[in-house]
Amino acid sequence: MLPFKLVYSDAYYLPIGNHVFPAEKYRRVRDRLIVSCVADAADFLEPEPANDRDILLVHTPEYVEKLRTGTLSLREEMEMEIPYSRNLAEAFWLAAGGSILAAQQALADRVSISIGGGFHHAFPDHGEGFCMIHDVAVAIRRLQRDNKIQTAMTVDCDVHQGNGTAVIFAGKRSVSVPQAGVAGLRMSHTRPGRMRGGHSSEVFTISLHQHNNYPLWKPPSSIDVDLPDRLEDEDYLAWLDKTLHIGLRQFKPDLLCYLAGADPYKDDQLGGLALTIDGLKKRDELVFQVARSRHIPVMVTLAGGYAQKVEDTVTIHTNTVVAAKEVFT
């Protein structure tokens, strides 16, 4: 039995047909965890969908109405890059509910993992890049509204920059400063983003991503690390370690939201980095070890993963749970 809870529903499945996004990966990760005896049935919690009040903490009423009524324009649907359906919208509402539940559990158990979520390309008023609702942002804003947390940090290790995250949590920004090195570290000299309505609840955003990849426009996070093509394990882990310590010297979050994307993998169809499966597990271990040493609860979502062999994506996501078990046991 795990010392923390996993959040999962069969209804996490995204009904998008033949698509590069492996919609079946969530179920396959759940099955692998049970078959390999990493987890048992009692470790899983079933989420409820987020309600519209929660969704509206992040998304505009006009956008939510379009999603509820199926009235997205053709351009809006094409920008989202997945075919709209009522069932698809319901799956995203459920993913947001799953991230809320995982965040709540993380405060109780030090860590919790949603076997889904991480839809970081969703903006307040539109979706992009396979993302309709920004589940992580909804979870953060819900916990802030409930006075469970004041501050949060997002650590996004998907191969693609979290453009939606950066915009949602944007503070008052000045010029980003590029620094020399193997990769480019851009730090925005700003306050972290404040909640709508002038509340003092703040969010600090970190993104490590391939520079020469989607999205073309990368709005500034609190810290962006622009990684070069085909970066391998050792250099990636060095940049991650450096970035975490820089961020945590500047900001003390009540909750760390970790987007554990599988797409920095060397054989990912939509990525251009060169991490190995072992290197990605070490990445997860590093994030968990840093958070544990500083007594920061961690909520995890799976984010992207498009390996040529779906089994590799499943292994990478499964290893995230294994790494959490090893660090937090």
Task: Give short role names for the model-derived ranges.
Residues 46-53, 114-120:
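Short, glycine/charge-rich beta-strand/loop segments that flank catalytic centers
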Residues 10-16, 49-53, 75-88:
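Glycine-/proline-rich flexible loop or hinge segments
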Residues 1-50:
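N-terminal low-complexity, Ser/Thr- and acidic-residue-enriched intrinsically disordered segments
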Residues 74-329:
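A general "terminal functional-core" signal
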Residues 48-72:
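Charged, often glycine-rich, active-site loop that binds/positions anionic groups
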Residues 33, 37-40, 62, 70, ...:
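Short glycine-centered helix-capping/turn motifs at secondary-structure transition points
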Residues 2, 53-55, 100:
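Active-site rim/adjacent substrate-binding subdomains
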Residues 41-52, 299-308:
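Acidic carboxylate-rich catalytic motifs and surrounding loops in phosphoryl-/glycosyl-chemistry enzymes
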